[in-house]
Amino acid sequence: WWYGHNAVGFFLTAGFLGIMYYFLPKQAQLPIYSYRLSILHFWTLVFLYIWAGPHHLLYTALPDWTQTLGMTFSVMLLVPSWGGMVNGLMTLKGAWDKLRTDPILKFMVVAISFYGMSTFEGPMMAIRTVNALSHYTDWGIGHVHSGALGWVAMISIGALYYMIPRVFGKKEMY
């Protein structure tokens, strides 16, 4: 799962962060909170994700140093991941009132919240003592589903709600 985790992480994290960084400011009609934070968090994710894969191979025949390295890099991923989450939520500073009536922003806030929860769970589950309890349980399955359905699906639905009316020359879905 070393390669698999990195492939999933890059396809389901980096690409959808791009969707968030494009559509969230468009819909909120505000600039992204911190361009510098977005650059820093993206490149830190790229650097750290490469070595995060071994956290799925704890308590296997993989050498201990590799398992420890994977665990360490996974825990370190919490910082850049939450940098992206905070950047997304802070972009809405001054536009939280729009959340009451705007379904696109609702989908995006739910997605960003799931991204935050998922990226908190992942590093915690990578810690050896937590992994000993959580491995081979439904917690791992729930973690994957919160990332895939909560983060990826919700940000995608929000983006589709933004794009579909514009494809047909309208400003809003209804």
Residue ranges and their predicted role:
Residues 100-101:
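Surface-exposed, proline-enriched loop/turn segments that connect beta strands in immunoglobulin-like
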Residues 1, 65-66, 137-140:
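Membrane-interface segments at the starts/ends of alpha-helical transmembrane spans
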Residues 3-26, 36-57, 69-91, 105-128, ...:
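Hydrophobic cores of alpha-helical transmembrane segments in multi-pass integral membrane proteins
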Residues 127-135, 139:
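Interfacial helix-loop-helix junctions of multi-pass membrane proteins
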